[in-house]
Amino acid sequence: MKVLMINGSPHLNGCTARALKEVADALAAQDIESQIINVGNKDIRGCIGCNYCCEHGKCVFNDLVNETAPLFEKAQGLIVGTPVYYAHANGGVLSFLDRLFYSTSFSKVMKVGATVVSSRRAGSTSAFDDINKYFTICGMPIASSTYWNEVHGFTAEDVEKDLEGLQTMRHLGLSVAYLIKSIALGRERFGDLQLPVEARTHFIR
């Protein structure tokens, strides 16, 4: 069992990375493997709406998005970490997720999703909501914790002082692991959840 983790911060060893490490350690203690993909330090362009992916099964821009797609398909969970910029998620990680989710046709139903946000002070809950939208449109259950999944600080050293934030990350790791294992057991007994999309309208037509 494996979880793919996205670090949306340009700082590879910053606050977001520190939070994700705490989650990864909790997952490892539950025998769940994790792999981190660093996105925030990459030049990721946004979707241009060309629909190349609809015909070819991959994004027209052959970059980290296409490299990540098969890893996402094989993973049982996806955890996205982002710093908070002006009360929203990092623009680069949003561009990455737009293209990753839109260009991949494989089912994401029952893959566990979770968001981790890092802020110096405020704006974290709206950034948290930004990322969760990707999960809820795809039938992905969202793992929660004992507080909103956030840490506070300006440096990774600051995050070490956020004892409740780190506790929240550990609890999130346990929650993700529990959901993944429970869904696996459910599949053994009940099979895959089928959600056929038979209607697709533009509001009314």
Feature locations, PLM:
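Generic secondary-structure signature for well-ordered alpha-helical cores
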Residues: 25-32, 77, 101-105, 136-140, ...
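N-terminal beta1-alpha1 ligand-phosphate binding loop
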Residues: 2-30
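Cysteine-cluster motifs in flexible loop/terminal segments that predominantly coordinate metals
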Residues: 42-72, 199-205
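A short beta-strand-loop structural module common to alpha/beta enzyme folds
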Residues: 32-42
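Helix-loop-strand module that forms the ligand-binding subsite of alpha/beta enzymes
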Residues: 55-147
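Glycine-rich phosphate/pyrophosphate-binding loop and the adjoining helix
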Residues: 141-205
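Cofactor-binding loop segments of dinucleotide-utilizing enzymes, especially the Rossmann-like FAD-
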Residues: 6-8, 39, 117-120
